[in-house]
């Protein structure tokens, strides 16, 4: 208002000057063009202008428009499809509560982005580089097997899930305060659902946008510190080389052609599998659900008005019927149906904790060629048709559709469908978890639901202890061999095997490991003497200052096993043994030379020197193992125990010696673990036929101790057994189950299935995967993740021949 006088004053000052000349038509046109360009015509002229946001802040808040701000959270999948019926219902109800949390002032966008550009990264994760040793042929073979398995699944498709919520605010500070509160509540809701979730930074959100706009997989290079010196905006770092939207039914983005469609929800009842089935497509598909809550009071008023309108129409129809001489109860069926549905809807909103939502369901397909794109769209449309819905192309709205399909919280498509809470929640964003870790992750087969590879690292678990359970012939030993081979090839871990059935010789020999055959004759596989000294000790044997205390405890267990009897060792017996142990180790502790290492005979001699009659009794019991026919353990160790791969073959030990042999092997493993701990090295210990260790009180107690303490010392024990009942034989032994975060469960007998279902809370749907299944099929439990798996190892390989335990295949090999 104040600028007008100024303009007039300027006019008076110019009155005495030459009158301005008139502009030519061409000049007027040129100036109008400059003004039009300066003002803008509302259309995007660059790829950057197409992307509908103003500013992305480093903390993850995005200023979408002048008064609209959004934030995103990335969340992980949970096992919904295989959950127990009660768990499924609980997940669904919690998801309904989650949606009801958002009021009309918050817009929500669920984004599911399947990016098919990560094949190189997946191959990098499974690549086993060659080394300067004798195992490169095996590395190549194992690596080829992994690549072949990768090609069967869609691990090249990385599936991401995001929730974006947006609000109106006057300034960034006000937006930040409210978005922060919503973020906290959303994270708590995901915690209730059992889904891992994390807020996204500005960099992470830009990285997601870059991934959508560069489906070929170009790396994202950006840092917020680059913006000020360069004068560029964040859009310059994420925009593709070009957008083309002129074709009406398609868009082009860089070298890709794509199309955006929306889902017409026509079905009277919706199914929770539809979203899952579309996401299961092995194509680069992007699905977005824009959800906006309607104010509850407003929704109820609207429905009441509708009911009133329908009642008016009903009265008019009845009047018409009376005038025409018809029965007034005969009214159009649609009118009656709509009236009943409206009343049911009103009842839901008023008394059943339901709210009304407006939903826009968008599907983006992208491909290299138009033919491939049409095939992908046809596949997605077929799934929609299966559930009585329709996938309809957004003709001449491709730009708005694509920009509504990036996780910014902006919906530019006005096609919305009104749904109640439970109808909206049926598009549940959970299917099945995936397990594809990188680094030192080992291969365990393919996910039976998604066909994706299962790669995981037990060291990442809070408790890496493991169990491999299955009936004879289900593939237990093979699974253990595959894991230890994989660990041998890609880690520096030491591997020790307790082998009661002589099943591991071929594999250990091929990997240049050491097989120690413990037998009554003391002869190894090559006929030469092989001895292991049960009195071996190293100065790291215990985590406190006295390694002797723990070693004394082991020798007490050994003597208890030797003496036997229901009552075992009496207190005075234990005192005598402990004294003798301390005396016999004194020379070695004073001068820790291997030549000073005591043997059982030294303990026997020391016991005879003690004055108590109990000492003579214990010495007499030991005599059989010192100078008698079972004296195989009365020698200093003469075998190489420092090999990376050591297998203790105890098949030839008789009944009397086997119990002792099992205990001595466990002690040797403990020795090795303590040495490796000092070197910061992990030790994997495999116990086949684990039920044998649980039959004797001493070995069972030692096993429980291993399960409790190995983790702190870098040990990773794995028990392999077919006898699940033995694992539950006592409360103490049951701790082994509770202290195992890794379970590989193969086919199970009926009785064991019932026990395991109760112990591990396995649903009937999950139990199908361990019921009458083929070898190499089952369930993998990794922490809180439970997945069905299938492992088909190629038989035409050298590794298969040295790993198989099938008699006919062993003889062929």
Model region roles, listed by residue range:
Residues 1-430:
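Extended, folded cores of ATP/NTP-driven motor/assembly subunits in large transport
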Residues 479:
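Hydrophobic positions on the alpha1 helix immediately C-terminal to the Walker A/P-loop
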Residues 760-813:
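Conserved P-loop NTPase
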Residues 517-522, 742-751:
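Conserved AAA+ ATPase "SRH/arginine-finger" region at the nucleotide-binding site
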Residues 476:
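Conserved lysine of the Walker
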Residues 78, 85-104, 115, 277-279, ...:
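P-loop NTPase motor domains
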Residues 468:
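Hydrophobic anchor at the beta1->P-loop junction of P-loop NTPases
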Residues 486-496, 511:
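Post-Walker A helix-loop "phosphate-sensing" segment adjacent to the P-loop in P-loop NTPases
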């Amino acid at each position: 208002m104040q600028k007008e006088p100024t303009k007039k004053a300027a006019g008076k000052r110019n009155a005495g000057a030459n009158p301005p000349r008139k502009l030519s038509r061409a000049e007027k046109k040129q100036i109008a063009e400059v003004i039009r360009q300066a003002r803008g015509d509302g259309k995007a002229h660059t790829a950057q202008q197409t992307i509908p946001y103003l500013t992305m802040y480093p903390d993850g808040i995005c200023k979408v428009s002048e008064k609209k701000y959004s934030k995103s959270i990335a969340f992980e999948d949970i096992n919904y499809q295989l959950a127990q019926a009660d768990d499924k219902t609980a997940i669904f109800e919690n998801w309904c509560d989650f949606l009801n949390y958002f009021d009309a002032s918050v817009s929500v966008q669920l984004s599911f982005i399947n990016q098919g550009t990560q094949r190189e990264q997946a191959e990098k994760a499974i690549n086993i580089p060659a080394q300067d040793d004798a195992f490169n042929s095996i590395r190549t073979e194992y690596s080829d097997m992994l690549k072949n398995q990768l090609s069967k699944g869609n691990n090249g498709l990385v599936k991401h899930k995001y929730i974006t919520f947006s609000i109106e605010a006057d300034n960034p500070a006000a937006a930040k305060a409210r978005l922060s509160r919503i973020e906290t509540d959303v994270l708590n809701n995901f915690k209730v659902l059992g889904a891992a979730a994390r807020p996204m930074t500005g960099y992470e959100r830009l990285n997601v946008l870059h991934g959508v706009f560069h489906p070929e997989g170009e790396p994202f290079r950006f840092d917020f510190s680059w913006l000020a010196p360069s004068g560029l905006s964040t859009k310059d770092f994420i925009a593709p080389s070009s957008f083309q939207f002129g074709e009406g039914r398609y868009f082009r983005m860089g070298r890709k052609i794509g199309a955006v469609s929306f889902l017409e929800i026509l079905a009277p009842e919706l199914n929770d599998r539809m979203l899952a089935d579309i996401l299961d497509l092995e194509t680069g598909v992007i699905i977005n659900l824009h959800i906006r809550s309607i104010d509850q009071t407003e929704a109820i008023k609207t429905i009441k008005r509708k009911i009133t309108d329908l009642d008016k129409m009903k009265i008019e129809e009845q009047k018409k019927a009376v005038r025409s001489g018809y029965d007034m109860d005969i009214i159009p069926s649609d009118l009656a149906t709509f009236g009943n549905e409206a009343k049911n809807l009103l009842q839901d909103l008023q008394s059943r904790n339901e709210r009304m939502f407006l939903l826009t369901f968008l599907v983006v397909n992208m491909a290299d060629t138009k033919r491939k794109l049409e095939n992908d769209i046809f596949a997605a449309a077929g799934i929609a048709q299966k559930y009585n819905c329709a996938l309809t192309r957004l003709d001449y709205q491709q730009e708005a559709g694509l920009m509504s399909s990036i996780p910014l919280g902006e919906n530019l498509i006005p096609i919305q469908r009104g749904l109640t809470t439970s109808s909206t929640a049926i598009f549940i964003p959970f299917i099945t978890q995936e397990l594809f870790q990188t680094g030192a992750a080992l291969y365990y087969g393919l996910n039976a639901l998604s066909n994706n590879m299962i790669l995981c690292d037990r060291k990442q678990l809070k408790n890496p202890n493991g169990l491999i359970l299955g009936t004879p012939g289900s593939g237990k030993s093979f699974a253990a061999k595959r894991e230890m081979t994989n660990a041998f090839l890609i880690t520096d871990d030491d591997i020790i095997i307790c082998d009661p059935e002589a099943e591991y010789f071929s594999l250990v020999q091929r990997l240049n490991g050491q097989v120690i055959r413990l037998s009554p004759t003391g002869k190894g596989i090559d006929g030469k003497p092989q001895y292991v000294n049960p009195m071996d000790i190293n100065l790291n044997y215990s985590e406190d200052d006295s390694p002797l205390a723990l070693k004394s405890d082991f020798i007490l267990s050994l003597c208890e096993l030797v003496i036997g009897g229901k009552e075992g060792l009496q207190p005075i017996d234990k005192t005598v043994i402990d004294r003798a142990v301390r005396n016999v180790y004194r020379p070695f502790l004073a001068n820790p030379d291997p030549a000073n290492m005591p043997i059982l005979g030294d303990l026997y001699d020391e016991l005879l020197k003690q004055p108590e009659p109990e000492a003579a009794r214990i010495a007499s019991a030991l005599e059989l193992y010192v100078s008698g026919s079972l004296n195989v353990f009365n020698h200093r160790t003469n075998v190489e125990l420092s090999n990376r791969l050591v297998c203790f073959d105890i098949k030839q030990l008789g009944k009397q010696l086997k119990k002792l042999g099992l205990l001595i092997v466990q002690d040797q493993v403990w020795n090795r673990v303590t040495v490796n701990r000092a070197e910061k090295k992990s030790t994997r210990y495999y116990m086949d036929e684990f039920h044998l260790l649980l039959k004797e009180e001493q070995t069972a107690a030692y096993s429980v101790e291993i399960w409790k303490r190995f983790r702190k010392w870098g040990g990773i024990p794995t028990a392999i057994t077919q006898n699940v009942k033995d694992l539950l034989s006592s409360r103490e032994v049951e701790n082994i189950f509770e202290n195992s975060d890794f379970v590989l469960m193969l086919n199970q007998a009926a009785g064991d299935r019932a026990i395991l279902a109760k112990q591990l809370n396995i649903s009937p749907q999950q139990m199908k995967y361990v019921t009458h299944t083929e070898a190499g099929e089952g369930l993998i439990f990794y922490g809180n993740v439970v997945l069905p798996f299938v492992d088909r190892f190629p038989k035409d390989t050298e590794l298969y021949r040295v790993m198989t335990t099938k008699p006919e295949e062993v003889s062929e090999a």
